[in-house]
Amino acid sequence: MLTLEQIALAVKGEVVGDPAIQIISVDDINEAAKGSITFSFLPKYKTKISSSNASAFVTDSKDDLEGYNGVVVEHPYLAMIKILTLFSKNKDVQHSIHPNTVISESAKIDSDVTIGPFSVIGDDVIIKSGTIIESNVVIHNDVQIGRDCLIHSGVIIGADGFGFTTIDDKHHKIPHIKSVVIGNDVEIGSNCTIDCGSVKNTTINNSCKMDDQVHLAHNVTIGEGCLISGGTFIGGSATIGAHSMLGGKVDIGPHVVTGEKSVFAARSCVLKSVPGGQMYAGNPAREIKEKQKRDAVFTKIEILEKRLKKLTKNEK
């Protein structure tokens, strides 16, 4: 339980209303009750302040809180992160390795690493300080994981990539002799699969964040600070430029190189390399303005087709 004043101090915000009001939970604005604090900085939530049962609101404008208790902040999402952390049950992580974990004797794991039950850590794996590995994670031989990473349940890192050559209808497996290197401050969502490299390491650079069920094929390189949404598949030897954003179920083809700060809309299919600093959408993925022009052409064709049918019908 915290007072509104304590919360305001934590987020460097300004109290509006009663600073001594007691806050016991953080809730959605539609479900908030007495004792709740909620977030109302988006326009669609500002209109719900008057009908909400919350005791306090976090917003970016003092005008929103006339007659209500709340905290005004300059950066609402940073305040949201801080407040959720204050009320999180997991804020005090106990660093430990569960006894049901299987760890190779040759693995090098820093003392303050946390590993959950039924995880498997292979030969010569390196895991650096502050990293948390949840339950049922498999980390294959030679994988390197940097500091302060979070690996969610069900992740498999370092399994063989999908590489075959076919001669006379027989498939010959290509050996994968490299591994996976993960930088610092990386988060990998549940049930992601990251294949090891064949001739070079699969690499995820610092501060990348991956949603659930993302697949990285062999030899992939993910630049620093990328955000990758769920269901995305990145083909072998592809390179994603730093600080790029990939929406849900994006497909990146093998050997494709994307420039820095690219944005790919959900379900984009990227079949060839593209420059950075632009937004892409569609299948095949095109720069968004080009795609919109093409879509407009098809719309006009449909309109003309309907007119033509109407004229033909009238002639009959």
Segments from the language model and where they lie:
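Terminal amphipathic alpha-helical/low-complexity segments used for targeting or macromolecular assembly
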Residues: 1-100, 143, 148, 154-155, ...
